[in-house]
Amino acid sequence: MTQTARVKLTSTSLPKLDGVCGEIMGIGKKTGVKVKGPTPLPVKRLHVATRKSPCGNGTETYEKWEMKMHRRIININADDKAIRQLMRLKIPDDVYIELSLT
């Protein structure tokens, strides 16, 4: 019986995220299972504005910092062999993966 595995990927580095997506798609092609995705989700943007002057005097000038969180979803009709290969996948430190079976 095949199960559907939903893989959620999150990263601040878009090239590393796309690399992991490509590896997962390659596993799907090798094992011959049906793969849907990668579906891009909206980018989360975290903004932080800080005053440049540490003492509080002078003109109000601000530095603006932004961090983008890129997300992807891949659905795989996975059998045991495909799931084992997903578990062995080498994932970079700044790519977070969440795997749920339904």
Curated annotation (Swiss-Prot):
InterPro entries given in the database record: Ribosomal_uS10 (IPR001848), Ribosomal_uS10_dom (IPR027486), Ribosomal_uS10_dom_sf (IPR036838), Ribosomal_uS10_euk/arc (IPR005729)
Gene Ontology MF annotations: structural constituent of ribosome; tRNA binding
Alphabetized Pfam families for the sequence: Ribosomal_S10
Ribosomal protein as UniProt keyword: yes
Origin superkingdom: Archaea
One Gene Ontology cellular component annotation held by this UniProt entry: cytosolic small ribosomal subunit
Keywords for this protein: Ribonucleoprotein, Ribosomal protein
GO biological process, one term: translation
Record's keyword annotation contains Translocase: no
Family: Belongs to the universal ribosomal protein uS10 family.
Function text: Involved in the binding of tRNA to the ribosomes.
Assembly: Part of the 30S ribosomal subunit.
Protein name according to UniProt: Small ribosomal subunit protein uS10
Name of the gene this protein is made from: rps10
